[in-house]
């Protein structure tokens, strides 16, 4: 998923840790409430401080998460590539977000 990142506003920053223990900072671009339809929420992330490519686009990563019983956000999970309904919903919400930008 790519996003033309020509707007200028602050994003919340989170740290992701990969399987090797490497930490990477990401900016939260958008959160999506998918609890009613899929029983979980979604977050779209961009690498913190990343620059646009020659086409003016920046790489976006999407994850799902469920809230813990205490109301805190749980662990991020990759979205299955074969989950067309989830990806369609994410794309629809993201496109609406871009239209509002």
Swiss-Prot record:
It comes from the Bacteria. Pfam families: DUF1292 (PF06949). Coiled coil: none annotated. Signal peptide: none annotated. HAMAP family: UPF0473 (MF_01448). Belongs to the UPF0473 family. This is UPF0473 protein SUB1774. It comes from Streptococcus uberis (strain ATCC BAA-854 / 0140J).
């Amino acid at each position: 998923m790519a996003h033309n990142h020509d707007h200028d506003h602050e994003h919340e920053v989170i740290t992701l840790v990969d399987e090797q223990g490497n930490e990477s900072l990401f900016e939260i671009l958008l959160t999506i409430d998918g609890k009613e339809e899929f029983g979980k929420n979604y977050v779209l992330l961009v690498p913190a401080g990343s620059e646009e490519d020659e086409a003016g686009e920046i790489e976006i990563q999407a994850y799902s998460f469920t809230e813990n019983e205490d109301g805190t956000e749980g662990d991020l999970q990759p979205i299955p590539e074969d989950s067309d309904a989830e990806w369609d919903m994410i794309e629809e919400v993201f496109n609406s977000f871009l239209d509002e930008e």
